[in-house]
């Protein structure tokens, strides 16, 4: 069972600055659309994971380090969408529902440079992973969740490949 980032078991863990440097992923050989940063250990693991992919396939990091303000905007926007879809929903319930897809700011790994949004690319562009990047559960009929069954066989295979190389490099694929 997935533990959501809004869960008390997560939110009560203290966040401590370790001093680990942030590095430009491009300088580590990672494909990015523009300058993206992550903690050095994350960048190193991504570089290793990239080497595990078959010839012609690469990791492509869409977003790494995210300013707190951007994370808050994403969270606020998604919560507003959920409130429109579920009139009368309690603040607590919208918080939990939103955390299936967007990390609450107080524990969001992106704001620490500890998470990346990524996909796989080949010679002709992005590989099929079943949904566009950032498709919400509502927009994708739940297909954005890693174990979704309403995606193509090709997308399932590509998701499994992505999870395998990330895991082999010591990274965790958050399944929501």
List each language-model region with its residue ranges:
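Extracytoplasmic cell-surface/polysaccharide-interacting catalytic and binding patches
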Residues: 1-64, 68-175
